[in-house]
Amino acid sequence: MIKQADENDILTIEGILLDAVIWMKKNKLQNQWNEDSIKWNYLSKYYQVNDFYINYQNGVPAACIAITDLDLKYWSEIPQGKSLYIHKLAVKREFAGKGISEELINFAKKLSLKNGINSLRLDCNLQRNKLRMLYENEGFIYAGRKNLENNYDMALYVWHI
């Protein structure tokens, strides 16, 4: 079951994202997330709580995703409402490998169609090949790269109907 988040879900969102941060750190995976950047006082500068959706497995929070209709950081040329954007997709390790990422991506695709929007976009670390393969297997097409400070390269992806 996928549920749109509300104020009561903030700690759940933080917990799912923290699980991902710990796993990435343990596996020495380069990423932009850290313990501070997944706290709500930071996230709330960029997201509203209802941008988040939580995936539950047998009543247990397993994963989350943020879906927005504007991304000025990576896609400033796209007017608001012309595309949806996936952010903060994270699956708790105990639920990894069970198709939950794909379930959330498909949820985002259906949400875009429901809103009359024919594209879905995302960004991820250029070096995270396994993550990139997940997105490509879900029909996303590589649309370029963006270099951030500290030579941190992001891969940009788009899915069209």
Show which residues each predicted segment covers.
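Conserved GNAT acetyl-CoA-binding A-motif
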Residues: I105, S112-C124
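C-terminal "cap" of GNAT-fold acetyltransferases
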Residues: N118, N125-N129, E136-E138, G144-I161
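Conserved acetyl-CoA-binding loop-helix of GNAT-fold acetyltransferases
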Residues: V91, G97-K110, M133-N137
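Charged catalytic carboxylate motif
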Residues: T12, E103, K130
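Conserved N-terminal entry element of GNAT/NAT acetyltransferase domains
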Residues: M1-L11
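Acetyl-CoA-dependent GNAT
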Residues: E7, G15, I22-K26, N31-E94, ...
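Conserved functional loop/turn residues at catalytic and ligand-binding sites
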Residues: D9, K88-A90, E94-F95, G99, ...
